[in-house]
Amino acid sequence: MQNISKILVDADACPVKDEIVQIGTKFHVEILFVASYAHRSRKQQGNWIYVDSEQDEVDFYIYKHAKATDLVITQDMGLAGLLVKKGVYVLSPRGKFVTDEQMDTILYSRYVSAKLRRQGTYTKGPKSFSKQDRQSFLTSLEKILSNYKGIL
């Protein structure tokens, strides 16, 4: 794994912002939260970039600015698919490291679900975010940054 130069966060609906600040600060990694103006919050730690509230503006910003030495935290698998092709590291808020090898399956599943919705059939969405998901994220992020810093 190359050195992680910064963490970019798809922050609009990210449930682990505090954890990102906690672990990123511990490892002295720059953190950049990207959100739409519609999701502006008074409680802000770290560096924030706000973009227009148009659909996918956050994704466009992250895609344009992410480099192969960056880690992006997102639950948007469409964005993740584009980023892994650029060599960007991608981690979901549930602690799953997204790889290029997984993307065909992930995107096909997303396509099938969208097709079913257009036909009026709705599948179950993701389960509620749990304490286990939060812990899995913390463990994964710390492991990634520890490997980068040569600690583990």
From Swiss-Prot:
It comes from the Bacteria. Disulfide bonds: none annotated. Belongs to the UPF0178 family. This is UPF0178 protein Bcer98_3021.
